């Protein structure tokens, strides 16, 4: 299986990354099949080879989570709603509604006592 992942390079504590296509069993900094882009997390600079990335994605290459977010920002992939995020938002909304109801109940009970 071909993976799209980040390959680290640069000085110590000043890492930059190349976006590469490689075999899923190869090492992080091993020899890639193809270099597809560049990402610098300090300056947020991103360069993508869009044609080569589209070809690799149509061939079935699987991007890692970080590469997926970079491709979403670059417009190559649609933003995918991850289930854990959607569940977390729904849970927060339910908690807000429950708090509002409990505050209403407290204010009603205080008015009844007066």
UniProtKB/Swiss-Prot annotation:
Residue ranges crossing the lipid bilayer per the database entry: none
Gene Ontology biological process terms in this record: translation
Keyword match Kinase: no
A Pfam family matched in the record: Ribosomal_S16
InterPro entries reported in the protein's UniProt record: Ribosomal_bS16, Ribosomal_bS16_CS, Ribosomal_bS16_dom_sf
Gene source species: Prochlorococcus marinus subsp. pastoris (strain CCMP1986 / NIES-2087 / MED4)
Superkingdom assignment: Bacteria
GO molecular function: structural constituent of ribosome
UniProt entry keywords in alphabetical sequence: Ribonucleoprotein, Ribosomal protein
Protein name: Small ribosomal subunit protein bS16
UniProt GO cellular component terms: cytoplasm; small ribosomal subunit
Family the entry assigns: Belongs to the bacterial ribosomal protein bS16 family.
